[in-house]
């Protein structure tokens, strides 16, 4: 099992839809200060169900939604999609790839999907119980 890709939109500093591919064996994120490395890690934690804003260096969960800049308007939604390789069958679904998506609206409503089917946080957590 390994992270295959991460797609981030409206999450923290990622105002534009950003797609990151990971290769099997990737163990580090490298880049200069302020380029978003910590926000990539926060995005992975968040899509997997992190409920503490403080664990993601934020005051409230709404703070993970892109808040705008002088040249860009704030967004009303944050969305992160994580694709995980399950070729070794370590997760309890009989498929080679599992996609988990989380979306948060400024209203506070949060939604989860597993492989395109709407799910609950409990379902996301259950995927990883035996890992």
Task: Identify the residue ranges that each predicted region occupies.
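Gly/Lys-enriched N-terminal cap/neck module of very large, oligomeric protein machines
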Residues: 2-131
């Amino acid at each position: 099992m390994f992270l295959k890709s991460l797609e981030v939109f409206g999450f923290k500093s990622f105002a534009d839809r950003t797609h990151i591919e990971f290769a099997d064996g990737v163990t580090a994120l490298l880049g200069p200060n302020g380029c978003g490395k910590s926000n990539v890690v926060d995005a992975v934690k968040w899509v997997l169900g992190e409920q503490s804003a403080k664990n993601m260096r934020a005051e409230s969960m709404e703070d993970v939604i892109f808040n705008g800049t002088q040249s860009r308007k704030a967004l009303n939604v944050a969305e992160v999609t994580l694709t995980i390789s399950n070729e070794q069958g370590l997760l309890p679904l009989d498929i080679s790839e599992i996609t988990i998506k989380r979306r948060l609206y400024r209203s506070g409503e949060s939604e989860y999907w597993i492989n395109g089917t709407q799910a609950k946080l409990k379902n996301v957590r259950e995927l990883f119980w035996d890992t």
